[in-house]
Amino acid sequence: MKKLILILVVLFVSFENVSAKDYILEQQGKRILVKEHIYSKTDNLKVFRLEGTFKDNAGNFGETNSIVNVITINNVVVKLEASNELIYNENIRAYNTAKRANNELKQGVGKWHFTYASKSINAIISSDCLYSIRYYNDNFLTLAKCDIPEQAFEQIKSIIK
């Protein structure tokens, strides 16, 4: 019984020290076709650039850009992967990879995973987000909700505005 109580206390103390914060990002901008391979009327590979701006719930406003690879078969997205760059004030940067969870062409949902970041905001590395994206002609709007450590949110909040 003492061992069980000790294990529960250790687990409780461990989880108490791990706190997470919701980090909300909104991006908008233009989608630019870089290259496409048209295999048939319904099958293709397209490489896009997304360029625009973002704002977050920590009061930041910055630039964003992405490189997106899309494979479509029978007019259905079978694979979509992207690398996204966020550029904050003072050239502070964070990078995440995106994977789409659905197969619609004009809108989508998926996950981001932060892979790299400037030293001043490096606590965001390994954080995950759920995102949704919607296209209108060559414009896009993305909303993301990220579960990041409290330390990462404080680092992001401390970026000079």
Sequence positions of predicted segments:
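Sec-dependent N-terminal signal peptides
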Residues: 4-14
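Beta-strand-enriched cores of mature, soluble protein domains
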Residues: 20-161
